[in-house]
Amino acid sequence: NYIREVFILQSPHKEHLQHLFDRLQTAIGQVITYEQEPRFNLLSWYSDFQWTVAIFPRKCWRPRQFFLEGNKQIMFSPGCVDMAGLIIAPRKEDYERYTPELLTDLFNQVSINTTELEAIIFHLKQKLSL
């Protein structure tokens, strides 16, 4: 029940993560059409002898409000940190307009939905069972 879907991969062995990540990237590509680069944001960290990778699949890079003009425009182009929950607002006026409802709408536009998540999981399971 989050407003953005995320895959969390963890292992003490980065080679295992690389293997799983490669398969996940392929599964995402079977559901979300790539243009020049894969559509996801990725955060990774190493703590307590454990690697963690968070992958946020994306439908698009920017919501429709980004392309509006004048006072209707909202400069929202979420990167890794934003997708992880720390919202960076490049303009004060946009920050002052943020509400839970608006942020939910913005993230829903750029994030995959539950149906797409389930399709990625289906393709991933097929790859892992080979």
List each model region and its residues.
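Conserved His + Asp/Glu catalytic blocks
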Residues: N1-L130
